[in-house]
Design a protein with these regions (language model features):
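A short helix->loop->beta-strand "cap" motif at the edges of active sites that frequently abuts
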Residues: 7, 28, 87-91, 116-118
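Short beta->alpha connector loops at strand-helix junctions that form conserved
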Residues: 13, 32-37
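Active-site phosphate-binding strand-loop segment of PLP-dependent enzymes
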Residues: 35-104
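Phosphate-binding glycine-rich loop
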Residues: 1-8
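Hydrophobic/aromatic ligand-binding patch that stacks against planar heteroaromatic rings
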Residues: 21-23, 84
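PLP-dependent aminotransferase class I/II
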Residues: 119-180
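A short helix-loop-beta submotif of the ANL/AMP-binding
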Residues: 25-31
């Protein structure tokens, strides 16, 4: 529903190495743009994004806080991403698996960016938040009905996560805020 073979996705680097493998398996080209250590790995300038956007560009992937750098995108950076996604009709795939690991600054979810509802696909997992690495239990969250419908078709064709992971996941989401 979001990407087809031959499409491109922009990712600020350094990035989670598996994004490259996932894209390759789908026939999608990763177009990296470099974030710099001198800026603490802040979001590269929007002009860098503009330079690499083509008619094949369909999405931007971010991870905030970033894996592997730990950089937390600011509200201003998230708003800049919103503007470019709307301007070019791009999806914003937001990996928010590390959202509990914010030590400085305000965590801003892509789902909370007004006007971006139809462009955001949030990816999350219990493995980081609840120290359940290996459980492979997560979520894809979107308000875009076409994306949701496509995900549900895929979900119907896929086997479920292991029973123990499901039981553990259900118990984990009921933990009190004091857990964190």
């Amino acid at each position: 529903a979001c990407l087809n073979p031959g499409d491109e996705v922009i990712i600020p680097e350094p990035f989670y190495a598996n994004y490259n493998g996932f894209a390759c398996a789908a026939g999608v080209t990763v177009v990296p743009i470099t974030s710099r250590i001198e800026t603490g790995f802040a979001l590269p300038p929007i002009s860098d994004f503009e330079k690499v956007i083509t008619k094949r560009t369909k999405a931007i992937i971010i991870c905030s806080p970033n894996n592997p750098t730990g950089y937390l995108y600011s509200r201003e950076e998230m708003e800049a991403l919103k503007k470019i996604c709307i301007k070019h009709n791009l999806y914003l795939f937001s990996d928010e698996a590390y959202r509990e690991f914010c030590y400085d600054g305000e965590y801003v979810s892509a789902m909370h960016l007004d006007g971006l509802d139809q462009h955001v696909v949030l990816m999350d997992t219990i493995s980081k938040r609840y120290s359940a690495c290996g459980a492979r239990l997560g979520a894809l969250v979107t308000k875009n009905k076409a994306v949701y419908d496509a995900a549900m078709k895929f979900a119907q064709a896929r086997l479920s996560p292991p029973g123990l992971a499901q039981i553990m996941g259900e118990a984990a989401v009921d933990l009190p805020a004091s857990y964190f």
